Amino acid sequence: MYIDYLSLTGFRSYAQLDLELKPGVTVFVGPNGTGKTNIVEAIGYLASLSSHRVSSDAPLVSFDAGQALVRARLVRGSQRTSVELELNPGRSNRARINRANPVRAREILGMCRTVLFAPEDLALVKGDPASRRRFIDELIVSLVPRHAATRSDYERVLKQRNALLKSARAAGRFTSSHEATLEVWDQHMAVAGASLLAARLEALHRLQPHLQSAYRDLTDGSKAARAVYRSTLQGTVNDDGAVVSDANPEELYGLSEPELAERFLAAFAANRRREIERGTSLVGPHRDDLELILGQAPAKGYASHGETWSFALALRLGTYYLLLSDDETPGAGPILILDDVFAELDVQRRSRLAGIVSGAEQVLVTAAVAGDIPEALAGELVTVVPGGISAPAL
């Protein structure tokens, strides 16, 4: 898969940008602040409906624009598809496919597949659990786009249940009315939580061998990398937000969704008093974590800076390997985006990463200095200037 045309209107620093792209490697070069990342951010947003830089859509829309438009023409084998995404801060985003009538933005998920590497990826290893939960949730949607609804359903139920717990806490007592209503939301959250947890477990199971291969490819192979799912069904959350548990995480993989739902109901009952006291849900996928293990030790706190970078890159590269294996149809591979990554890496890691990704159908790279880009990724050079492109703009 590749994009051969991209148009941005009112997106970040671009009042209007029209850009032709080719298969192979394209390198966007320009000083920091000129808008290189804005270009690849738009493509990443088209694929995931989220930004790797901000949590809301508002910053994506130019200050003096009421909305932003991202248009792209996707090429997959002999098929060309035009996709348009309309960003409306404070209102629902809309999309168009081949200029047809508007549909929900979610309808375009899965049409454009990307894997994006960025300096922010260090947070996957060094940061709090929220970064890793976001990673696994992005993965489940990349593999099965309908899981975007699975995630949003859980978030909706969680919001309602938390509101009820907060209300009970504010009232100073837990009434029979609270109990009856909470039991209803327990059922909803158990089912929604089981669906989301099952999707995460399946995705992690599929990612695991590719993560291990990716880490070996990026390093000398002296240490093995793996990820362990830590569920609040099997432990408690400490002050740092991490799940502490001595239980065998593999046990969860053998449970069906109805069995997981029963586990959630039991956990809700066991934590009822604590949840009312705190006015929030203490058990569920929203508090789970991925524990990243390097060799025999947790990567967080024990890995060197170089190892931390290698692990972060391996998570993304492993995702690329998985998506390639998920659909072996010619032309179906994801677009690779490397946003200001090479400036952060030593020469050896630069060389290894470049050698691996150079064979992808389309690779989009940003860099402040062209000299940061390894020779293996020599390709079309596009100079970015404030508000535009010097070449090859239309």
Predicted regions and their residues:
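Conserved NTPase motor "head" modules and their coupling/switch loops across ABC/AAA+ ATPases, GTPases
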Residues: 1-31, 174-335, 344-348, 352-355, ...
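Nucleotide-state sensing region of NTPase/ATPase domains
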Residues: 47-147, 210-213, 260, 267-273
